[in-house]
Design a protein with these regions (language model features):
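FIC/Doc superfamily catalytic core
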Residues: 1-229, 233-397
Length: 397
């Protein structure tokens, strides 16, 4: 194949749909093109497909924006393990993806520390436990910890027929994966222990792979193997976040990744399907279609829960250092950052949600932080809505 033809095919908008490429360029041309990609550009991974052959990826064809990197490397000023606003959306979107009914009010109720009142809230509580577990960087990625994460977030809430056997880390029978156009079986049971050990070893390897790419590869491979009877997608998304937390991306749990997936979950499932369909044509499994999807539809669209600009933080930090911020005000400020992010709130709402301060204390806090330029205020009738961020005049309403 000459260079001009190769370049034309490489830049084709249907690059990751080899069946469409065949229609446009011919079966022979696409086969030769795929072979050249594998030989000259694809990087092998220490993971295998269902035939026991290595997975590959094309690192230069899934670009991550600089802004996405900055977002995930930003340090949330909240003292909490995760953003309440962001993780409310994360849990809500996860259940949307799985077609499980939930409400944001029930999710916030559980995240605020209340006990579950029904089966729906028990599932939410499981997600909360999972998020708390991966938020602790002392909880390293091991097969034992992965099993524990699965049990507390999902496994404990499944019907008996979908539960793992005692002392089993993975399923003991066949499973079929739904979500795409046609169901397909997961990895054969006897191969799961070896494949999952390789996956965990890969997560812990210092191999120079871009960490955001690697997180998405872990996400893909986990769901591809499907090690459980149920809850695989949910655990794959938690695994993705867990890896980013372990790698020092502090904003990962202040970012509702699953919201972007839920907005177009068909594209999410199609990315999986493209990997498998392309393998039938190319003769090897290239995970780049999933990486390309994740970079464009998730990473490059990220907006971490809003925090004040640097100048506002300096105002707060200076006041804190000078003893002008009380301990209760510090706790309230951290709660506001975590619970509301960029959302508006009222003093009554903050009193109800925070649960550990009198209304007079809440009122004094919002007035003081508005005067400092840390909160904006908007009057609507008899109500005042506050939001994190500075105002033009800094005067109280």
């Amino acid at each position: 194949m000459d260079g001009a033809q190769f370049a034309k095919m490489l830049s084709d908008k249907h690059l990751f749909e080899l069946n469409r490429m065949e229609y446009k360029y011919s079966t022979v041309s696409v086969k030769e093109f795929a072979e050249l990609l594998q030989q000259n550009f694809a990087q092998p991974l220490p993971l295998t497909d269902f035939s026991g052959n290595k997975l590959f990826y094309l690192p230069n064809l899934a670009q991550i924006s600089t802004n996405a990197m900055k977002q995930l490397l930003s340090v949330p000023v909240s003292g909490r393990n995760f953003g309440l606003s962001a993780m409310t959306e994360e849990i809500y979107a996860t259940f949307q993806i799985e077609s499980i009914r939930s409400t944001r009010s029930s999710i916030r109720y559980i995240l605020d520390g209340y006990a579950p009142r029904d089966e729906q809230e028990a599932r939410i509580y499981g997600m909360k436990r999972g998020l708390e577990f991966i938020a602790n960087r002392q909880n390293r990625i091991t097969e034992e910890n992965l099993h524990y994460l699965y049990q507390i977030s999902t496994g404990d809430y499944l019907p008996d027929e979908d539960r793992l056997l005692p002392n089993h880390f993975y399923r003991h029978g066949e499973v079929f994966i739904v979500g795409g156009e046609e169901p397909r079986p997961g990895l054969p049971t006897e191969r799961l222990p070896g494949a999952m050990k390789c996956l965990v070893d890969f997560a812990n390897a210092n191999d120079g792979i871009n960490e955001l790419h690697k997180a998405a590869i872990l996400h893909f491979a986990f769901a591809y193997y499907h090690p459980y009877f149920d809850g695989n997608g949910r655990t794959a998304r938690l695994f993705h976040l867990w890896y980013l937390v372990q790698q020092g991306y502090p904003a990962a749990l202040f970012t509702p990744f699953s919201r972007y997936i839920a907005e177009n979950k068909d594209a999410y499932y199609k990315a999986y399907e493209r990997v498998e369909r392309n393998a039938l044509i190319s003769g090897y499994t290239d995970v780049t279609p999933f990486l390309f999807y994740f970079c464009n539809e998730v990473y490059n669209r990220l907006q971490v829960d809003a925090v004040p600009p640097k100048t506002d933080l300096e105002v707060y930090q200076t006041a804190l250092a000078e003893g002008k911020i009380t301990e209760k005000e510090r706790l309230l400020w951290e709660y506001v950052l975590s619970a509301y992010g960029a959302e508006e709130f009222t003093t009554k709402q903050l009193e109800k949600d925070f649960r550990n301060a009198a209304y007079a204390t809440i009122r004094t806090f919002v007035m003081k932080f508005h005067e400092m330029g840390l909160l904006t205020a908007r009057k609507a009738g008899n109500r005042v809505f506050y939001r994190v961020g500075g105002t033009s005049d800094g005067r109280p309403l």
